[in-house]
Every structure is written in structure tokens, then in C-alpha cells.
Amino acid sequence: MATVSRKKKKVKVTPEGAVHIKASFNNIMVTITDVQGNTVSWSSAGKNGFKGSKKNTPYASQVTSEAAAKEAFDLGMRHVHVFIKGPGAGRDAAIRALQGAGLEVRTIKDITPLPHNGCRPPKRRRV
């Protein structure tokens, strides 16, 4: 069976965009989109070589957001609005890394979903 090579879709990048940071207890994912929501660049802790419990550290979060921000900066993005979701460890480190990579952070919004007493949580760990 012959392999089919697919051409990567070129995204026209505007100087304004959005950064979506999902910081869970196990991993961190950073996606940078344009104003319409089309993905410009993305990165995760696993993509940057972190394994296991090291994925949920502030340093992994810093490296992850620097990698995504550098790619978006090279494509022409300069100003971003940040949306953070989740309770992970490296939320603040991710924002500082975005600013360090040259992106100007205009707004920061926490969009972590909070239940109005929805599902019963899992039982407490006894170690």
C-alpha cells in the first residue's frame, strides 16, 4: 500500500490571537489559535519529552508554553488573550513563559468548569 503524503494547511496568522492552556493534574496542553479559533501552534508536556509525574511540574509547563509561543511568534503573532482551564501546577509559569517568548498578554481569563454540586467525587486516597 502506497503512503499518501498530505500537504500541511497554511494558516494566515494575524497579530492578534488566543492561548488556551489546559492544566490537568497529569499533563499540560497549550494551544495557540487565531481570532476565528483556527489552531496556529500547539504543544504539550509529553511532546516536549517529559514523562510520568514530571509532566505536571511548573518547569514542564514553562517549556511547553515557550515552545508553542515561539512557533506562533515566528508566524507573526504578537498579542494574545489567555484562557486557562484546570487545576494544574504550572498555570502561572505558563503565562510568564508566554511573556518571556515575546507575546504580549492582553487579558487572562480562568475558564475552569466548576460544578454546581454535580457528580459525586471519587473516594479519598488512603496512602
Swiss-Prot record:
InterPro entries named among the record's database cross-references: Ribosomal_uS11 (IPR001971), Ribosomal_uS11_bac-type (IPR019981), Ribosomal_uS11_CS (IPR018102), Ribosomal_uS11_sf (IPR036967)
Taxon lineage: Bacteria, Pseudomonadati, Chlorobiota, Chlorobiia, Chlorobiales
One biological process term in Gene Ontology: translation
Function: Located on the platform of the 30S subunit, it bridges several disparate RNA helices of the 16S rRNA. Forms part of the Shine-Dalgarno cleft in the 70S ribosome.
PROSITE patterns per UniProt: RIBOSOMAL_S11
Gene Ontology CC terms, in alphabetical order: ribonucleoprotein complex; ribosome
The keyword S-adenosyl-L-methionine is annotated on this UniProt entry: no
Family: Belongs to the universal ribosomal protein uS11 family.
GO molecular function: rRNA binding; structural constituent of ribosome
Quaternary context: Part of the 30S ribosomal subunit. Interacts with proteins S7 and S18. Binds to IF-3.
Name of one Pfam family that matches: Ribosomal_S11
Organism encoding this protein: Chlorobium chlorochromatii (strain CaD3)
Highest taxon, organism lineage: Bacteria
The keyword Endoplasmic reticulum is annotated on this UniProt entry: no
Annotated protein name in UniProt: Small ribosomal subunit protein uS11
Alphabetic keyword roster: Ribonucleoprotein, Ribosomal protein, RNA-binding, rRNA-binding
Disulfide bonds: none
PANTHER family attached to this UniProt entry: 40S RIBOSOMAL PROTEIN S14/30S RIBOSOMAL PROTEIN S11 (PTHR11759)
